Swiss-Prot record:
Binding-site residues for Mg(2+), renumbered to this chain: S173, T193
Matches recorded under Gene3D superfamilies: GTP1/OBG domain (2.70.210.12), P-loop containing nucleotide triphosphate hydrolases (3.40.50.300)
Protein name per Swiss-Prot or TrEMBL: GTPase Obg
Organism, as annotated: Escherichia coli O7:K1 (strain IAI39 / ExPEC)
GO BP field: ribosome biogenesis
């Protein structure tokens, strides 16, 4: 299936149903009073993370999602039916962004996690709500409010423990094929890898980690050169980055310059990503003598000002790969992911249900007061009849 990691969709929540103006009519009850019911609430639009999905390709074709409108109120104090909700399933790792404000609405990082992206409209009030001692036959009602409408940008970011960086043909795909069951395409030309891929590295029956391979970067990627930096976002959730360097490039380029290009592109994309733990890994050492490879790796590390430990491996022959993987596993165990507890704060809304309906009732009451006739005269027949019956 084609890998798609970005999609734009429109979500529209259902409008609230309108209130009803109705009066009770039964035999021998000529004036039964108001019995108009309230409308129903509009349906909501939800996002739900599903671990069985791995691409956003479905939302390249289906771009609009609309929840059901609430039904209008009816006579006999019947409340309208609430509109049905709409649930949009997305892969785990999807980030939801409101294109109108640029605000990140949420990150879908757990299977079954749900996120409200569009709230349905509130129901309108029927005329039963407006009856009072001075208004026995109210003909007022309120309409339901419109539901939320948003244009959303969905960004899929892979969930991996380890991310791989490097120039094209640095051996990233060969490495992931050597340590996992993933089989990305491998060839002797640049940009063989066109989309990110994941591989699970199993060290034993209990220990494993996930590694992500992204297309190679070249100079000017931040400005859109090559495949650009659009795939770097898949490394934002990684705990450690493996920077693969071809120790003896076949095209004759300088390994030091190549390494600096990767570092520069990381810093241009995100300072947070550039600050992540990054390990230097020299690949293709099988093409050189052991002493020559060690000497060259030391010279490159010194030129880069690298003072930490570095690794010499051959992804093709497996030399040094197992030791590197065990060190990565140890690092992951010693640096577990810290789950920040979400602060339990009240839901941020513009106004609450009770406030809205109370305001509607107060406005109607003010209108009734303005229209009230303080001077009683013979034309007020309804008032005379009412007083007589009491």
């Amino acid at each position: 299936m084609k890998f798609v990691d970005e999609a734009s969709i429109l979500v529209v929540a259902g409008d609230g149903g309108n209130g009803c103006v109705s009066f009770r009519r039964e035999k021998y009850i000529p004036k039964g009073g108001p019995d108009g019911g309230d409308g129903g609430d509009g349906g909501d639009v939800w996002m739900e993370a599903d671990e069985n999905l791995n691409t956003l390709i479905d939302y390249r074709f289906e771009k609009s999602f609309r929840a059901e409108r609430g039904q209008n109120g009816a006579s006999r104090d019947c409340t309208g039916k609430r509109g049905k909700d709409v649930t949009i399933k997305v892969p785990v790792g999807t980030r939801v962004i409101d294109q109108g404000t640029g605000e990140t609405m949420g990150d879908m990082t757990k299977h079954g996690q749900r996120l409200l992206v569009a709230k349905g409209g509130w129901h309108g009030l029927g005329n039963t709500r407006f009856k009072s001692s001075v208004n026995r036959t109210p003909r007022q009602k309120t309409n339901g409010t419109p539901g939320d409408k948003r244009e959303l940008l969905l960004e899929l970011m892979l969930l991996a423990d380890v991310g791989m960086l490097g120039m094209p043909n640095a051996g990233k795909s060969t490495f992931i094929r050597a340590v996992s069951a993933a089989k990305p395409k491998v060839a002797d030309y640049p940009f063989t890898t066109l989309v990110p891929s994941l591989g699970v590295v199993r060290m034993d029956n209990e220990k494993s980690f996930v590694v992500a391979d992204i297309p190679g970067l070249i100079e000017g990627a931040a400005e859109g050169a090559g495949l650009g930096i659009r795939f770097l976002k898949h490394l934002e959730r990684c705990r450690v980055l493996l920077h693969l360097i071809d120790i003896d490039p076949i095209d004759g380029t300088d390994p030091v310059k190549n390494a600096r290009i990767i570092i520069s592109e990381l810093e241009k994309y995100s300072q947070d990503l550039a600050a992540k733990p990054r390990w230097l890994v020299f690949n293709k050492i099988d093409l050189l003598d052991k002493a020559e490879a060690e000497e060259k790796a030391k010279a490159i590390a010194e030129a880069l000002g690298w003072e930490d430990k570095y690794y010499l491996i051959s992804a093709a022959s497996g030399l040094g790969v197992k030791d590197l993987c065990w060190d990565v596993m140890t690092f992951i165990i010693e640096n577990p992911v810290v789950q920040a507890e979400e602060a339990k704060q009240p839901e941020k809304v513009e106004f609450m249900w009770d406030d809205y309906h109370r305001q509607q009732l107060e406005e109607i009451a003010e209108e009734d007061d303005e229209d009230w006739d303080d001077d009683w005269d013979e034309d007020d027949e309804e008032g005379v009849e009412f007083i007589y019956k009491r």
